[in-house]
């Protein structure tokens, strides 16, 4: 009984203490919005949480559960018309898109009546994956936008749109339609050197631009940049990047500055690296499905995790369904919810319908604090758009006035 009273008082303090600041917005801008605040609290923050071998096992288990991801190295050379048609239709079934007859007809499903031979290609720039074969609309919440792929990503090409402008592809963690002009087609042996490059840099900052000819191409955190070798000359790496000539892949050398924005290996998986990596996105614009060359909530946490070599699914619902479970919120009181969230480790992912957040820790008052790519929140029934990566607590509300703490469905963390 005494413990229950303490929890109840803690919850009351939690909500009363945030009421005045909530009216001014959900973003925390004091010392808690700095990585140093959290790193200084972790005496063992740089100790390794998972070894490389353990991360391999974690990735393998997640891959088994995620029906959007694929083991491309062992991908079949052919795919049946039935299976491919089901996959193409799954994209629109999952999100119930409203679209014109012409756009749906452009999927060219009437011509899909026999097994298809898989072709191999590599992305030459950051490219959008679309749920239907149509270009972006310019809408900040374009419902046909799936995600975005980095340059130099190996993909399996499965089908083409009726107008010949889009290819239906399977990437490591997503499938959908991409602009065919962003794909360099090649043979499987060359393709494998991009799927598993022998020498590469890992992008450890939120965004890294590399000049290829007269164009800057964008790599996001966790992306691999293939290298010609591991030699540094004049503080520059020499990248090996794909371009398109006569419709096929050719390679070009590009210079990459040897700075703290890249590493020759994935970062160690530590508590402090969850903090450091997440704060590199602080203030970035919210980019639905990777639009605006940025991240939404699930891409944000995916990139933080992959910078340490952990491959989690792209979408929040898949992340919650495929990652190891820390907690599920079924029939628990508010006090119990607060206790569970307080015990979740730094780097844990907190889920509520349509959103995912990364836990930073508990502040000096014991309040759990999160960092996330937030689109909007509600205040007194009014929807307020923030559209940025920010630090907050879990008191902000949804459309029905329910605080985030009360709407959490689960917490996930590798193990």
Positions of PLM-derived features:
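...with weaker cross-activation on analogous glycine-rich loops/strands in unrelated enzymes
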Residues: 148, 313-380
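A conserved hydrophobic secondary-structure block that centers on an alpha-helix together
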Residues: 142-175
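Loop/turn positions that initiate beta-strands
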Residues: 152-153, 220-228, 346-347
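Low-complexity, Gly/Ser/Thr/Pro-rich intrinsically disordered linker/tail segments
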Residues: 30, 36-37, 373-377, 381-415
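Active-site nucleophilic cysteine motif
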Residues: 274, 288-318
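Bacterial N-terminal signal peptides
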Residues: 8-15
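Second-shell loop/turn segments in exported
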Residues: 142, 260-265, 283-292, 346
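Boundary regions of SH3-family modules and the immediately adjacent low-complexity/disordered segments
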Residues: 24-130, 140, 156, 170-208, ...
């Amino acid at each position: 009984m005494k413990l229950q009273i303490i929890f109840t008082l803690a919850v009351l303090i939690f909500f009363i203490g945030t009421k005045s600041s909530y009216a001014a917005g959900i973003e925390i801008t004091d010392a808690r919005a700095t990585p140093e605040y959290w790193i200084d609290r972790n005496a063992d923050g740089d100790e390794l949480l998972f070894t490389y071998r353990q991360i391999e096992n974690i990735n393998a288990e997640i891959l088994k559960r995620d029906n959007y991801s694929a083991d491309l190295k062992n991908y079949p050379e052919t795919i049946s018309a039935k299976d491919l048609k089901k996959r193409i239709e799954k994209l629109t079934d999952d999100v119930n898109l409203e679209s014109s007859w012409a756009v749906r007809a452009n999927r060219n499903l009437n011509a899909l009546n026999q097994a298809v031979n898989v072709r191999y290609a590599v992305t030459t720039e950051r490219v959008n994956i679309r749920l239907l074969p149509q270009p972006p609309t310019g809408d900040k919440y374009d419902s046909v936008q799936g995600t975005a792929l980095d340059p130099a990503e190996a993909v399996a090409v499965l089908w083409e749109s009726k107008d010949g402008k889009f290819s239906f592809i399977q990437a490591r963690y997503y499938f959908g339609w991409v602009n065919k002009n962003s794909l360099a087609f090649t043979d499987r042996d060359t393709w494998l050197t991009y799927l598993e490059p022998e020498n590469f840099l890992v992008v450890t900052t939120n965004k890294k631009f590399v000049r290829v000819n007269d164009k800057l191409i964008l790599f996001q955190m966790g992306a691999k940049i293939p290298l010609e070798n591991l030699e540094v000359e004049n503080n520059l790496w020499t990248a090996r990047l794909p371009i398109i000539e006569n419709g096929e892949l050719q390679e070009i050398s590009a210079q990459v500055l040897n700075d703290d924005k890249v590493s020759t290996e994935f970062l160690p998986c530590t508590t402090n690296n969850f903090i450091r990596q997440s704060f590199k996105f602080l203030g970035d614009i919210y980019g639905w499905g990777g639009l605006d060359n940025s991240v939404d909530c699930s891409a944000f946490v995916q990139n933080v995790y992959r910078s340490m070599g952990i491959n989690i699914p792209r979408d929040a619902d898949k992340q919650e369904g495929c990652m190891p479970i820390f907690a599920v919120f079924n029939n628990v009181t508010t006090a119990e919810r607060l206790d569970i969230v307080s015990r979740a480790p730094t780097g844990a992912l907190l889920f509520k319908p349509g959103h995912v957040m990364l836990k930073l820790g508990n502040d000096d008052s014991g309040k759990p604090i999160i960092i996330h790519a937030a689109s909007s929140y509600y205040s007194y029934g009014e929807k307020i758009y923030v559209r940025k990566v920010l630090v907050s607590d879990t008191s902000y509300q949804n459309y029905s006035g329910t605080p985030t703490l009360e709407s959490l469905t689960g917490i996930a963390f590798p193990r």
